[in-house]
């Protein structure tokens, strides 16, 4: 069986590698080819749980959706989830290996090459094309010796590379030239094309620069993509900088999301952002908080540390004040834990803080332990069937002054019967371990209509928004954007030249 490969690397983080890889996945899938995305090592706090209960990075999930296939942990065999500025949880083939500091991991990571290549080779055996993505920049010369994700991975897969450069930040030609010239000659020769991304204005103004960079590097500029408002899941928390900080006064409902320092799985909020009557804003300070209709405390990779920070910056007090003044509150995973009475970490799983008081809005107590729960789950709340996934270390017990949020009926395809989450006695505070809770359109609209009625507004009917249908539309737009702004003859030739038996 023959297989083709193409790899996107960037001059910096957030250059657009993930998006362009997704675009190519959709283009090739639309041609009828079997396509799989691949990123050997991903560092992200946004993760996903597969049908088999394996944890993987979110970017390869939306790339798999673009490729019209189910997410498979082989698409992202190594996932690093930072827990502090120096330490990360190392996840190999979907399961926790251990926590490691940066120096230890740098010395260790080449031992992971057999697992990486097993994942890559088995995907290559099953697909027509593998679309690879690098991480950050391939020109980090202090890290290149043990590289397993950029040119190191390109060499292992013998994949041609497209270099993606973000012009919106300025200095695009310097970043292209510097990135290429810092590479060994062998790696420079692997780059077959350059794409300039996020351009605003008249492309003709770039032509002289494109010709000059082609002459300086010997590599053709095969495309210039415009800045786009296409709405695809973001993986890097740097993308939160672009999120709204103020309410859209044209929308009926004000939803405020606490922008935690160690925020994770902020993709949970995406389904609310596309609702016709909802304005979503991200809150960094107590002054910004106000009294939203719905206040969301999202997931956290270090719940104890984020709770300490919330108290220091005054947001904890602001949350309590907002609730007193009428805001409904939903906590997801770490946010659920924060809403409780107490958090215990006797063995230092998350942090040196052995115990601390929560915000006290739910009658729950959480104890962190080494066992990590990773499941795809199906739950029921009242008459609503809810689908989501769990990623947490520790257990939460409810007291007498709260009721379960839902009953888990299935995990990883197997029957289950256990309770999840908690709801305050007055129904104004909800906590759940289910990520993706707002991706359930009927329950979400029910919740939003409750908020509307509380404000004296009529509920919206026949306005449920399917996140899956919405995403599919965005992938088609992304594929079209790529095809219209890239020299597809040159791109197809690069892909064709990569063919291997």
From Swiss-Prot:
SUPFAM superfamilies, from UniProt?
Class I glutamine amidotransferase-like, P-loop containing nucleoside triphosphate hydrolases
Q: InterPro entries, alphabetically?
A: Class_I_gatase-like, CobQ/CobB/MinD/ParA_Nub-bd_dom, CobQ_GATase1, CobQ_N, CobQ_synth, GATase_3, P-loop_NTPase
Disulphide bonds annotated for this chain are none
Kindly state which keywords UniProt assigns to this record, in alphabetical order.
Answer: Cobalamin biosynthesis, Glutamine amidotransferase
Pathway involvement of the protein, from the record: Cofactor biosynthesis; adenosylcobalamin biosynthesis
CDD domains linked to this entry: CobQ_N, GATase1_CobQ
Report the family membership: Belongs to the CobB/CobQ family. CobQ subfamily.
Please identify the protein, giving its name as recorded: Cobyric acid synthase
> From what organism does this protein derive?
Limosilactobacillus reuteri (strain DSM 20016) (Lactobacillus reuteri)
């Amino acid at each position: 069986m023959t297989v083709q490969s193409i790899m996107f690397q960037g001059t910096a983080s957030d250059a657009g590698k993930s998006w362009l890889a997704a675009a190519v996945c959709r283009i090739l899938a639309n041609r009828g080819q079997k396509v799989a995305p691949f990123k050997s090592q991903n560092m992200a706090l946004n993760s996903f749980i597969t049908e088999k209960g394996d944890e993987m990075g979110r970017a390869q999930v939306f790339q798999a959706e673009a490729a019209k296939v189910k997410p498979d942990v082989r698409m992202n065999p190594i996932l690093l989830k930072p827990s502090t500025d120096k330490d990360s949880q190392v996840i190999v083939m979907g399961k926790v290996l251990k926590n490691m500091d940066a120096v230890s991991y740098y010395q260790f990571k080449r031992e992971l090459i057999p697992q990486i290549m097993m994942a890559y080779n088995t995907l290559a055996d099953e697909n027509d094309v593998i679309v690879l993505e690098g991480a950050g920049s391939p020109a980090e010369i202090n890290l290149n010796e043990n590289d397993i994700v950029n040119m190191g991975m390109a060499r292992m897969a013998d994949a041609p590379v497209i270099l993606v450069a973000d012009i919106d930040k300025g200095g695009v030609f310097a970043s292209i030239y510097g990135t290429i010239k810092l590479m060994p000659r062998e790696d420079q020769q692997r780059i077959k094309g350059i794409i300039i991304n996020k351009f605003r204005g008249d492309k003709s103004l770039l032509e002289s620069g494109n010709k000059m960079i082609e002459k300086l590097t010997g590599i053709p500029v095969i495309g210039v993509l415009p800045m786009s408002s296409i709405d695809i899941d973001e993986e890097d928390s740097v993308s939160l900088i672009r999120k709204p900080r103020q309410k859209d006064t044209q929308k009926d409902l004000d939803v405020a999301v606490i922008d935690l320092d160690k925020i994770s799985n902020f993709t949970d909020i995406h389904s609310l952002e596309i609702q016709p009557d909802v304005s979503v804003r991200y809150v960094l300070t107590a002054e910004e908080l106000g009294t939203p209709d719905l206040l969301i405390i999202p997931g956290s990779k270090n719940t104890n540390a984020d709770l300490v920070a919330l108290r220091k910056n005054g947001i904890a007090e602001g949350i309590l004040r907002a609730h007193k003044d009428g805001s409904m509150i939903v906590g997801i995973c770490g946010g659920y834990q924060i809403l409780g009475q107490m958090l215990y970490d006797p063995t230092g799983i998350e942090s040196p803080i052995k115990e601390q008081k929560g915000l006290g809005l739910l009658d729950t107590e959480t104890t962190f332990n080494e066992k990590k729960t990773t499941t795809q789950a199906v739950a029921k709340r009242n008459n609503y069937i809810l689908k989501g996934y769990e990623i947490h270390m520790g257990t939460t017990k409810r007291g007498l002054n709260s009721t379960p949020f839902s009953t888990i009926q299935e995990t990883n395809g197997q029957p289950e019967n256990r309770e999840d989450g908690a709801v305050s006695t007055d129904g104004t505070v909800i906590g759940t371990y289910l990520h993706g809770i707002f991706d359930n359109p009927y329950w979400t609209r029910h919740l939003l209509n409750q908020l509307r009625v509380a404000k004296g507004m009529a509920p919206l009917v026949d306005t449920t928004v399917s996140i899956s249908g919405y995403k599919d539309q965005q992938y088609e737009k992304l594929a079209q954007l790529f095809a219209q702004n890239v020299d597809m003859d040159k791109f197809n030739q690069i892909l064709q030249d990569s063919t291997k038996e």
